[in-house]
Amino acid sequence: MRRTAVYRDPLFLAHQTGRDHLESSERLRTLDRELDRPEVAGQFVFPDFASATIAAVQANHSREHIREVAATAAHTAFYLDADTRTSNASYGAALRAAGAVIDGIERLDRDEIDNGFCLVRPPGHHAERDQAMGFCLFNNVAIGARWARKRLGYERVMIVDWD
């Protein structure tokens, strides 16, 4: 039987984007309800994982950008750009999301799992080195790819994005 890890955390639900925002916690709440069903939950592994370190995030993002995102923790609502709204939980959730990706890559490398799915918020594949973009605070995909290359010695990493 395949070992599929599903990464989820209540902190991802605490990232608030506003009632009418396209990127909503309801997406994960719906999936959580399904995953909590006994006949479904038994098919997956739900690993414990740590948040990404600042050093891991800094491998892909500038110090200034990280400070800008961290500063949003002082606000109940703050816009980093026209599409990217944060709340006081967003910075912590973003570090946790990047940590989920790193942990999944580490477990895949150690052959502890066959595949993984990161049910994270805020999403993380549009952010650039120096700015949030497209609902994303940090680029979890780039952070994970760099981790695989620099820490685990992978020469190439393929990224497929179909949104």
Model-found features: residue ranges?
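HDAC/HDAC-like amidohydrolase catalytic core signature
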Residues: 1-162
